[in-house]
Amino acid sequence: MSMQPTDHIRLTAFVHGHVQGVGFRWWTRSQALELGLAGSATNLDDGRVCVVAEGPEDRCRELLTRLGEQPSRHRRVGTVSTVIEQWSEPRGVEGFTER
């Protein structure tokens, strides 16, 4: 496992709303890669999408803003009603996957 810079952080965001079957995970991946973040976007059985992103804290916070902003300034697909965030230490993930 590679060492992470101390300013790196892990964001886990549970996105509620109409976010499955609309290209939301693809959009999230494109935004995360644009920001230089690693992680994943995963459909959950209850209709939410779980977004995990690791990287510099300011970029993770920017992704969080993009996930929930109303109206979206970044052409976000779907309709987001709520985003629940959790912060933790990074685990050293690489790339960004849609699951």
From Swiss-Prot:
Domain Acylphosphatase-like: 10-99
Catalytic activity of the protein: an acyl phosphate + H2O = a carboxylate + phosphate + H(+)
Family as reported in the entry's similarity comment: Belongs to the acylphosphatase family.
Lipid metabolism recorded as keyword: no
GO molecular function: acylphosphatase activity
Name used for this protein in its record: Acylphosphatase
Gene giving rise to this polypeptide: acyP
Assigned EC number: 3.6.1.7
Native source organism of the sequence: Corynebacterium efficiens (strain DSM 44549 / YS-314 / AJ 12310 / JCM 11189 / NBRC 100395)
Keywords: Hydrolase
Pfam families: Acylphosphatase
Record-annotated active site: 25, 43
Superkingdom of the organism of origin: Bacteria
